[in-house]
C-alpha cells in the first residue's frame, strides 16, 4: 500500500519528524511504500470561499445549522492542513487504490499489514 507522509519541506522539525516516521516504517517491516509528500502551506493554498465563522457562532442560511468557530491560532494553517489531505484524497481516486495518509509525526510501533481490499470496501 502506498503511504504519503505530509511534510512541510522548508521546516526542519517537520522534515526530521517525517524521516523518523519513514524509519519507523522500515524498523517495523511494515507493508507500506512510503514517501514524503509536500504539504500545502499558507503561502501555497488555493483560493477558498471561507464561510465558516472565525469568531462567534452563526447560523448557516443553507442548512439552518449553528456553526461554531474552530479554535486555531492561524486559520490559514488549518486550511493548508485540510488542503494537504484533500489533495491526497484526490490522488487516491486518481490512482484508484487505497492509500495511507500520515502526518509527519506519526510513528509505527508494530508492523502494519496492508489489508486485502475489494471494490465494495467502504460502499
Show the residue positions of the predicted features:
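An acidic/histidine-cluster motif and surrounding catalytic segment
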Residues: 1-102, 106-123
Amino acid at each position: 500500500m502506498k503511504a504519503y507522509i505530509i511534510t512541510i519541506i522548508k521546516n526542519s522539525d517537520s522534515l526530521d519528524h517525517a524521516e523518523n516516521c519513514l524509519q519507523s516504517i522500515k524498523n517495523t517491516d511494515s507493508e507500506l511504500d512510503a514517501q514524503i509528500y509536500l504539504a500545502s502551506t499558507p503561502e501555497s493554498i488555493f483560493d477558498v470561499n471561507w464561510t465558516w465563522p472565525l469568531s462567534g457562532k452563526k447560523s448557516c442560511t443553507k442548512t439552518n445549522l449553528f456553526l461554531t468557530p474552530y479554535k486555531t491560532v492561524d486559520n490559514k494553517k488549518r486550511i493548508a492542513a485540510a488542503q494537504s489531505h484533500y489533495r491526497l484524497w484526490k490522488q487516491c481516486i486518481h490512482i484508484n487504490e487505497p492509500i495511507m495518509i500520515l502526518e509527519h509525526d506519526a510513528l509505527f510501533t508494530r508492523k502494519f499489514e496492508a489489508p486485502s481490499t475489494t471494490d465494495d470496501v467502504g460502499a
